[in-house]
Amino acid sequence: MEGGTDGGVQVVSRRMVRPFTSPPMANGNGCHPAKEEVEVIHLTPWDLRLISIDYIQKGILLPKPPVSGVSLVKALQSSFARALRLFYPFAGRLASEERGDGTVSVFLRCTDEGAEFVHAVAPGVAVADIVSSLYTPSVVWKFYSLALVLGADAATESLPVLAVQVTELADGVFVGMTLNHSVGDGTAFWHFFNTWSEIHRPGGVGITDDLRGLSTPLPVLQRWFLETCPVPILMPFRKLEHIVRRFERTTVQECFFTFSAASVRKLKARANDEMAGTATAAISSLQAVLAHLWRAVCRARCLPPEQGTFYSVVVGCRGRVNGIPPGYVGNAMVFGKAEATAGEIEEKGLGWTAWLLNRAVASFDEATMRQSLERWVREPDFTYMSNLSSAGTALVTGSSPRFDVFGNDFGWGKPVAVRSGAGNKADGKATVFEGPERGGSMSLEVCMAPDALARLVADEEFMNAVSLPA
């Protein structure tokens, strides 16, 4: 199907890709159940609370492949279909059921209707246009489909829960993936990406038809619920639309800041040295980097000393809650919040600011998380971007430097860069990735109001820790 041109990006084709085959039996590791009716996956509180935010949109910039056009697209669609064989719920559709008692439930139907695969071209865009500046060009947002779509929209409009757009550039290719956040979190997102790239990389060598031989762990598709949790969860709303809040999208710009492994070690050592002699837990590398950002952003926003500010950070539940297996595909994350005034953050230093973030994460032990899940069933609350990004005083960080981004070699070279799409972009959104040199390096994709972002780039203390683009 022919598409149109959008910001120099022209859609060439758009189709649904279904899982390669239907495996014969269920084993909890990605095979279809041997029955004719449509399998239904009920969503957990961790899934449902994210129903009113945008899809996850992240992608990788790859070198120019040895083939192009239809040959490239057909090969990628073939490996994509094989990856969907393991992650077959990603080819399904979200649905909701409004009940006569004033409640609604949401679930994932494993219908095999397919995931969207878009082929696009942007011959006027070069790799250097994306990576040679601190500022991210706006064209990057055009490298994704299903832009600015909320999770609930997939149920009300029967949209795919997963989409991929392959955009051929002048001297490279960008693979942008979009996943409904109620279907999976960042761990699940990169698990699928890693699986797909590994399947494609050898051209099938060493991987059998049933996909044995993969080094990437097999996905575990069965959802995890508390023993006391009702399934399905009936939320006290007459319609799914009553849960949804669409946030006002203000004008923002993005910069991509990379911190070398040496710079990260220096920030971590400084933060821990400043807190030496106090009864505090060791501050992590990520907490030190985020504290460095928080302090600089308060300066860039020109916040008065008495102004309250907060930082919301994603806290992973895998490894914190017993019973969640390795390879779990679903959401297993919550938001922790650190709060202080701008004056405190400036005066008390990097170590104290990092300690606030450390305490926000440490407050989520297993007992706390279980209590939160039990309470959610009785009193559901939802994540809204308008709450996470508050009037130019807040920051929110998602993703993780532990995600394997630069291991996604599709067979013609490792990624040159990683960039995300328009999803959930608001003033104060900072997305963290592993750095391109790996080995402890990190990158922050920071989205802010243009004037404040310009002041951040001009902040000498902040930029001294940043590696400038070549």
Enumerate the language-model features and the residues they cover.
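Cytosolic, low-complexity regulatory segments enriched in Ser/Pro/Gly with interspersed Lys/Arg
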Residues: 1-40, 75
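Soluble acyl-CoA-dependent acyltransferase catalytic core bearing the H(X)4D motif
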Residues: 13, 23, 34-38, 52-89, ...
